[in-house]
Regions:
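Short helix-loop-beta junction
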Residues: 531-533
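Conserved short alpha-helical segments that host acidic/polar catalytic motifs at enzyme active sites
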Residues: 1-512, 516-520, 525
Length: 533
């Protein structure tokens, strides 16, 4: 398996929240928890969980988290480093007042999200843009710089979570639409000649005519794609995202281009588990449509430059290469490379990008989920799922779409999503393809189904949060699962029984003769332990 992440944004009238209001909400949480602490000795565990103070604290924490979410919340934190530090201190007060035995997911999830999804994300983004401490704010940065930074950091966090699907290599592409070519750093142009599309590679949109004229472009505007990659056979969870973070934060060309951006960036990222093709940066995704023509100038001039990330296998890739007279650059051996190549060729022969995309997808055999973007049309993100066992989750966030291979890849930004792929929540079809547009990003109106007999699936609300899926202090997710087995049993029982039901009476009356504990994998260990109690 592999993991895909993408985010596409639209411009909006941002209304950053007043951090003083957020601070007051957190102070309210502290006051409610202090009152709860005073009453704790007089209340038993059940009454403590159902107390009015706890419900109020949870509501206030959720309000604070909502205000800090999205680009508006991030902008407020970035522009007010001192107030952000005060929020962190107030949050610590609240966290220290939580009773050890407390099990209130609304409160715990909200406080966790404020700490990790809001404050820590803002701090990491500050460093990503070259700010060394909280005293250096991002007040001089535009909405588009901040939006790109938030998308990049969100992608890196998502890659960490998606590593359970594979981690031998990873990559992240940042697509900046329609930059003024006269303002581009001259050092940028030498980075476009890496046909293997490895770490630090840069690509330009086709209309710019980049490779035919080194150090200058033929158009006034050019879409620029920065790509960063890492590949390692041996490593720890989190190593890849840290390597990408270092590469991105050290790229002065990227910072210069972000400074002149007048539109929101599109970010496409991927973590790989190699099934076909060696573990290398050349085989790491995202992949581009550069071919083995020997004259890379032809790609990016006569054909649209396409970037794609793929999860799954294209079984007929060799046949497609032969039939369409395509070839991989030397060193690229992954079957997925055929995806951007064929999409680019189809787009070259069509004025309709969406139709060209479906024309290419309909030729693929196998089982895969894919996300693609043409640099000539950076306002669209193209998605497709075909074959068995594949899904993509399209998150509906504030002014943006967040896409991932698993729900836990989108949770940092939203808990509302639409599922593409197999399952009762989606359209039954051999393949599904949609286009996401910046114009209505974050809204169902921004999702165009490619095919007359397909409809947008219903919106689903996730039942988990980032607190549930974090690896935390554990080196591996397996260790986390084992350590949380007792809690899993407790939560399972709580979801099926309440203190008011007749379960206790059944046990006392001798009506229960047998209890069956069922589990798979590490859950089987919990089931066995439960059976031996």
């Amino acid at each position: 398996m592999c993991g895909i992440f993408a985010q596409i944004r639209r411009s909006a009238n941002l209304r950053p929240p007043d951090l003083k209001q957020v601070s007051q909400l957190l102070q309210g949480v502290v006051e409610q928890l202090q009152q709860l602490s005073d009453d704790a000795n007089a209340l038993d565990a059940d009454l403590l969980q159902e107390s009015v103070e706890l419900a109020r604290a949870a509501d206030l924490a959720q309000q604070a988290n909502l205000l800090l979410s999205g680009l508006a919340g991030f902008t407020a934190l970035a522009n007010n480093a001192e107030l952000a530090a005060e929020l962190s201190a107030g949050l610590s007060q609240a966290e220290n007042l939580i009773p050890a035995a407390l099990e209130n997911p609304q409160l715990l999830d909200a406080l966790w999200s404020i700490r990790h999804d809001r404050l820590q994300t803002a701090n990491k983004a500050l460093k990503l843009l070259g700010s060394s401490s909280q005293s250096n704010t991002l007040q001089c940065l535009s909405e588009f710089q901040l939006g790109a930074t938030l998308s990049i950091q969100t992608a890196l966090s998502a890659l960490d979570r998606l590593e359970v699907r594979g981690r031998d290599s990873a990559g992240l592409s940042i697509i900046l639409p329609r930059l003024e070519t006269g303002q581009l750093p001259t050092s940028l142009f030498s980075r476009q000649y890496d046909d293997q599309f490895t770490n630090g590679s840069v690509r330009f949109s086709a209309e710019a005519g980049s490779r035919s004229a080194p150090a200058r472009l033929q158009a006034d505007l050019a879409t620029v794609c920065f790509t960063y990659k890492v590949a390692a056979t041996i490593g720890k969870l989190g190593d890849n995202s840290q390597a990408l973070y270092r590469a991105i934060s050290a790229d002065s060309d990227l910072r210069e281009c972000l400074a002149i951006a007048q539109e929101h960036a599109l970010v496409l990222a991927h973590t790989r588990w190699a099934s076909l093709g060696e573990i290398s940066q050349a085989n790491a995704h995202p992949l581009d449509s550069t071919s083995a023509s020997g004259r890379p100038a032809e790609v990016g001039i006569s054909r649209p430059l396409v970037i794609a990330a793929v999860n799954g296998d294209i079984d007929n890739h060799s046949e497609l290469l032969a039939n369409h007279d395509l070839a991989f650059p030397t060193g690229v051996t992954t079957d997925s490379k055929v995806v951007p190549l064929l999409i680019s060729k189809s787009a070259h022969n069509s004025d309709n990008l969406a139709q060209a995309f479906t024309t290419a997808v309909e030729q693929f055999e196998g089982s895969a989920a894919l996300a693609a973007c043409s640099l000539d049309n950076p306002d669209k993100l193209l998605l497709s799922v075909f074959g068995s066992g594949q899904s993509l989750y399209v998150g509906l966030a504030d002014d943006s779409f967040v896409v991932a291979s698993e729900p836990y890849g989108i949770l940092e930004q939203t808990n509302k999503y639409i599922r593409l792929g197999g399952g009762k929540d989606t359209v039954k079809h051999a393949s599904e393809a949609v286009t996401l547009s910046t114009e209505n990003a974050g809204k169902t109106e921004g999702i165009a189904n490619l095919g007359s007999n397909r409809t947008v699936s219903e919106i689903i609300t996730a039942e988990i949060t980032t607190r549930d899926v974090t690896r935390g202090k554990h080196a591996h997710y397996l260790l986390k699962e084992i350590s949380q087995s007792p809690l899993s049993v407790s939560k399972t029982l709580q979801s099926q029984a309440s203190p008011e039901n007749v379960l206790a009476e059944l046990f006392q009356g001798g009506k229960v003769e047998k209890i069956v504990a069922i589990g798979q994998g590490t859950a089987a260990i919990a089931a066995k332990a439960f059976a031996e109690i």
